[in-house]
Amino acid sequence: MLFKSKRKVYLDICKQYIEGDMSLDEFWNIYSKDKKMIKDIDKIKQKNEYYYPIEYYIASLKGNKPGFFGIVDLQRTVHNYLVYHNIEHRIIVKELPLHDKWDKIIPNYLSGDDRVYFMLEEYDSNKTKSNVHYNKWLLEQFKFEKYRPRWMHFSEWPIENGKPLTFQYQTGFPNNHDFIEYHFVREDGTKVVIEQYD
């Protein structure tokens, strides 16, 4: 059983982090080393369908901080933890709002690439146009010859000089093959092959 005073400390730490009064480094340093804090917050996380065991996740990072999607997941969990305990707070951290702002616009085959979120934000941070407009803009940036890739892990679509290369084709498809090659072409016609293990 967790003492109320201990939970109060956890809630205060979470509020400081989500409101931008504590850096990710500071929060991660406290959070990743406190098994009771992890367990208490993990209970809230389990109530959500996106649940991913935090202790396993932390162990898999081997002391490293999470990447963009891990940070989004962490911030959503912290936010839900505060909501569950009726703690008023403002979401000042940047990753969670950025993800939620653009996630429904980004096509599935690009949704695993955090760079796409930042590209959209740089293109129009005020989100003044329709979702269709942004979707068309993404298609202009991430071109493909005949068909789009089925899906790619994280930031594997090559971008050179700020411009994504044109996708040509892939060998195999996710969930059917353990090894997939994605073929791209530069403007000068030279080819780039990205190897991915499913």
Residue ranges of each PLM-predicted region?
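Long compositionally biased, domain-poor regions of proteins
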Residues: 2-198
